Amino acid sequence: MRFIHALLLAGIAHSAYASEKLTFKTDLEKLEREKAAQIGVAIVDPQGEIVAGHRTAQRFAMCSTFKFPLAALVFERIDSGTERGDRKLSYGPDMIVEWSPATERFLASGHMTVLEAAQAAVQLSDNGATNLLLREIGGPAAMTQYFRKIGDSVSRLDRKEPEMSDNTLATSEIQLRLLLWHVLWLKSSMAAH
């Protein structure tokens, strides 16, 4: 009798999960129709496995999504001792590009620290700060090398800001998921050993 109860509970749990997945997919498809857009979603567990997703294999324009892994690369360099967070990055008016609020604010002093630039790039999506960081790591090609180093064979960076808003460069939700998982989970689990 316990076995039958266990089977019933498992069946109920499975049908509830399947129903939630159907609702998730249906809701996303409805949102795509309403917004006349395609949406990619990857929900990941702590082991890096996708537990739910929509358009996970489709490529999407990177736009500003590369700023988070760029900051992660900068923090890796700080952690390894090849970079200092308080190091001043000098720049002039030529570094001011479309949407550079923090870079404009620091222009009078002529510099931002590495950490200030990373914070501005991620929190404000500051294009000037992003270009400062790209300059310091060796340019877009160095960012692509970082993608390869962490196992992302799809994503690439060919330009600086604001040209990254051009939708011709792409990554997939799967690759972005792997990238974020590497940065957020893998590093913390490695540090524990």
Language-model features, listed with the residues they occupy:
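Sec-dependent signal peptide recognition
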Residues: 1-8
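Hydrophobic h-region of N-terminal signal peptides that target proteins for export
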Residues: 9-18
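Beta-lactamase-like hydrolase cores
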Residues: 17-61
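Mid-domain, small-residue-enriched loop/turn segments at the edges of structured enzyme/sensor domains
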Residues: 38, 131-190
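Soluble periplasmic/extracytoplasmic beta-strand elements of cell-envelope proteins
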Residues: 40-44, 69, 90, 132
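Active-site SXXK
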Residues: 61-89
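Acidic helix-start/capping segments at beta-turn-to-alpha-helix junctions
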Residues: 85-102, 137-138, 164
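Conserved catalytic neighborhood of penicillin-recognizing serine enzymes
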Residues: 96-132, 140
